[in-house]
Amino acid sequence: MKHSWFITLLLLLAAQASFGQTRPSHLGSFDDRKLHIGIQVGYTQSKFDLHYTENDSVRQTVLGTTSYYSPGFHINVIGDLRLGDHLNLRMLPGITLISRDMAFDWSEAYTSTHWKYDFRRTVESVYGEVPIEFKFRANRYNDFRPYLTAGASWGFDFASLRKNKNNDDESIIRLNPIDLRYTAGVGFDVFLSYVKFAIELKMAFGMIDLRVADDDYYTLSTTDFKSRTFMLSFTFEG
């Protein structure tokens, strides 16, 4: 997996911490609080999970369609509710700016008779999101505590409102505005003198087909647009 090096690093850090001092030196009672808030910022890479069409007439024109990871950014507010010694419930409303690159392999017969076509297109979105997830925490070792997350995220793409009004503009790939994703992540908390800092790696997988089926080869060449996003996040909680 492309990002497996980061998971390996987290596991190595967790193993190293398990042999260290177990008495906290900073914020010893921080995780005993029932409720606390914070902020999360991070880097994203997003793409579409595509399914190539079975329509033979379209396949003769578009020989293949591929999506590639493209960079983005997200910022979220964190509300964290302690449910037990090793379990928290988190809500992280925020904004995510993402783009997805798509590549199209046109047949020579089509390109020799048409002049208006694109080999690559970028689809941009601005999501207002409400992720809800469980945080499963391991034992704390000194000022270090690894954890896992699992949950779901509902999002609304504000950029799609403008794009979907331009029904006749073939330069735009239109998307359904609502997306629902399930998420899974791994990270570790570091307890500093005044705040708790965390580094987190998360994957989000879309469950809804985002494609608006227009009468053009850019959307006819696929039968499914589902989102996939990798997130590297930095969290500060007080």
Language-model regions, residue ranges each:
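Outer-membrane beta-barrel channels and translocator barrels
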Residues: 32, 84, 139-143, 191-195, ...
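Short, structured loop/turn "capping" segments at alpha-beta junctions
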Residues: 142-146, 161
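Mid-chain, structured segments of secreted extracytoplasmic proteins
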Residues: 66-106
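Extracellular/periplasm-exposed beta-strand and loop segments of Gram-negative cell-envelope proteins
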Residues: 47-70, 98-126, 155-179, 209-229
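Predominantly the C-terminal beta-signal and adjacent terminal strand-loop region
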Residues: 177-182, 187-238
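Short glycine/proline- and aromatic-enriched beta-strand/turn motifs that initiate or cap beta-hairpins
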Residues: 20-72, 237
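Residues on the lipid-exposed face of transmembrane beta-strands in outer-membrane beta-barrel proteins
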Residues: 39-43, 73-81, 93-95, 128-136, ...
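Bacterial Sec-dependent N-terminal signal peptides
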Residues: 1-25, 236-238
